Structures are given as C-alpha cells and as structure tokens.
Amino acid sequence: MKSEIIKVKTKSKNYEVHIGNNLISKLRNIIKKNKLSFSKCLIVIDSKIPKKFRTILLRNLNDQKIFTLNFNANEKNKSNLSIDKIHNVLFKNNFYREDCIISFGGGITGDVVGYAASTYKRGIKFINIPSTLLAQVDSSIGGKTGINNKFGKNLVGSFYQPDLVISDINLLRTLPKREIICGYAEILKSSLIDSKKNFVFLDKNFNKILNLKGNFIINAILNSCLLKKKIIEKDEKEKNLRKSLNLGHTFAHAYEASLGYSKKLNHGEAVIFGL
C-alpha cells in the first residue's frame, strides 16, 4: 500500500500531511524529517482509542518526556472545562511554547486540543493524529479549532494550523461501519465541490472505499485533502472561497441541533441529509 505526503502552505504556517498505513509506528522518523524538536510532549488521547495503538505511539516518542491525558470525546466535553484541564497539565509541568501537544483521536478531540494549543502561551507546537475517517479527510487539515457554548456549536475557537498531521489508515480498521460512512459523507461532499472525475471514482469504488481497501481508501482521502489544501491556501480564514467547504452543513447543523447533538445522528450522517 502506498503512502502520500501533502505539503500545505498557508500564510500562518507550512506543514505536511502524511497519509498511509502503520504511520504511527514511524512517527519518530517523521518528526525528525520535519525538523520538529521538543523536550516535552502532552498526548491527549481519545478514550475510544484501542490500547494497542496507544502503546505503539508511546513507544515511538520515548526520546521525549511524555505526559498523557485521557479525553472522553463528546459534544458535552467540547467545553472550556476541557480546555482548562489540558492547560492545567501544561502549566503544572512547565511546558514552554517550544514543547508540543498531540491530539490522538477524532474530530472532537482535534478541535479541543487544537484550541488548547492555540491559547496556551499564545501558541504551542501541535501535532494532529486523527483516528476517524471524517477527521482524516476534513477537520485535521485547515486549522479550524474550537469548542461549544450554550449559544451553539463551535462558536468559540481559533484558526491555528498544526505543525504535522499523521493520517494512519490502520486506525480506521477498528471503527464501526457507521463511523466509516460518516467519513465517506465528507469525501462525497469534497467530490461534489471538486470534480466529476472524483465523483465518478467514488461511485465506481464505493464498496472498496467503505471496506478500506488498499490504495482506494488512500486515494479517496488524498483527493479530499488535496481539495482542502487548494482552498485553504487561497482562503485560510474563510473570508470567501473556503465557505464552499460548508456544502451540506447548513441543514446538517440544523438536524443535529434539533436532536440536541445526540448519538441518534452523527455529524457525517447529518451531512448526508444536508447534501
């Protein structure tokens, strides 16, 4: 199975997005090649991540002093309280801006950790390791971070680009089919924005992509990421062009809100209805 590297260049930061299989076992080398140096690292780990992947990740970061924090990723915990918990670990252990925080989880985890990274001493190094298909094709790239409040979803946040993104296909193999379909919704959205060629590719290889077959899933993720790269490099702060990436999301957010952001309807499923 091939691996791909996308180089994202924005006004605020340049970084690489790595897409492939068993990448977390190569994390030490990827960090070195990207010339990312830090002496301390906090890994915020989604509680749903299987233990075997946690072990692999920690084994590949033994050059640094490592701290971990478990995070129960849900909309309720996408809050200021979670930000405070992360910041408290960083302050108590005297993290500097040159140190690093890693998000190891899905989109909610990435949004929360990214916002914590952007607000700790006005910005600390941030590595995103998305563990869901939806996060790999969408939220892990582009720098949108945020939390919810009583007035709505994602209303408090920042634009803060990561220093590195690692999208490991192996992480997807433990997910339920429902989660894969949620990610496919964002892939479908990207194809509708991008080109007939990508849409036809999805239509032709639907089952292979849902079953995470070899280069088919790699190419599906790659195409979505390349579209997002192209758009955010022209419009990082969503002044105009980037708004096109919200296709299907107006109704999607309304559907989610009407159900109180319950597990009855996941975000990707809401996007399908929105489309």
Regions found by a protein language model. Give the residues of each.
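Residue-level signal for inorganic ion chemistry
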Residues: G20, I43, S79, P130, ...
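Glycine-rich beta-strand-to-loop/alpha-helix junction loops that act as flexible
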Residues: N74, F104-G106, L247-G248
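ATP/NTP phosphate-donor binding region
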Residues: M1-C100
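Short glycine/serine/threonine-rich phosphate/pyrophosphate-binding segments
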Residues: I108-G114, Q136, A254
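A glycine/threonine-rich phosphate-anchoring loop and its flanking beta-alpha core
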Residues: K9, G114-N207
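Active-site segments that bind and position negatively charged phosphate/pyrophosphate groups
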Residues: N205-L275
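Phosphate-handling active-site elements
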Residues: N94-Y96, K121-N128, S258-E269
